Curated annotation (Swiss-Prot):
NCBIfam families for the chain: PRK01018.1 (NF002172)
Top-rank taxon, per record: Archaea
GO terms (BP aspect): translation
Any one GO molecular-function label of the UniProt entry: structural constituent of ribosome
Annotated organism of origin: Methanopyrus kandleri (strain AV19 / DSM 6324 / JCM 9639 / NBRC 100938)
Disulfide bonds: none
One Pfam family from the record: Ribosomal_L7Ae
Record keyword Ribonucleoprotein present: yes
Xref: InterPro entries: Ribosomal_eL30, Ribosomal_eL30-like, Ribosomal_eL30-like_sf, Ribosomal_eL30_CS, Ribosomal_eL8/eL30/eS12/Gad45
Name the UniProt record assigns to this protein: Large ribosomal subunit protein eL30
Similarity comment text for this entry: Belongs to the eukaryotic ribosomal protein eL30 family.
Keywords, ordered alphabetically: Ribonucleoprotein, Ribosomal protein
Length: 109
């Protein structure tokens, strides 16, 4: 999990990442994200909406096993982050790392 956290941080710093559930859903409706990450404690209603639009857009959803506060910490933010959309992972290998983790059965949606 430390590798995924390191990759999330690098993607936030060097890539194009949008934080927040409302923005994530808007981008999913447009089919723009390459990956969506949701915190384990993301409210069920929001998570269901994200999963619905992600399925329509054929975008993988990774469930981060920590809380939204933990995800905010990893992103370097002093607030909760229930979900985030990755448009470009920059210098990180976040998308490949998460896909590999999901194939191995680590917290897939």
């Amino acid at each position: 999990m430390q590798e995924i956290e390191r990759q999330i941080r690098m993607a936030v710093e060097t890539g194009d990442v949008v934080l927040g559930s409302n923005q994530t859903i808007k981008l999913l409706k447009l089919g723009k994200p390459k990956l969506v990450i949701v915190a384990a404690n993301c409210p069920a209603e929001i998570r269901e909406d994200i999963e619905y639009y992600a399925e329509l857009a054929d975008v993988p959803v990774f469930v981060y096993p920590g809380t939204s506060m933990d995800l905010g910490d990893v992103c370097g933010r002093p607030h909760v982050v229930a979900s985030m959309a990755v448009l470009d992972d920059g210098e990180s290998d976040l998308i490949a790392t998460v896909r590999k983790a999901m194939e191995e059965g680590a917290a897939p949606s």
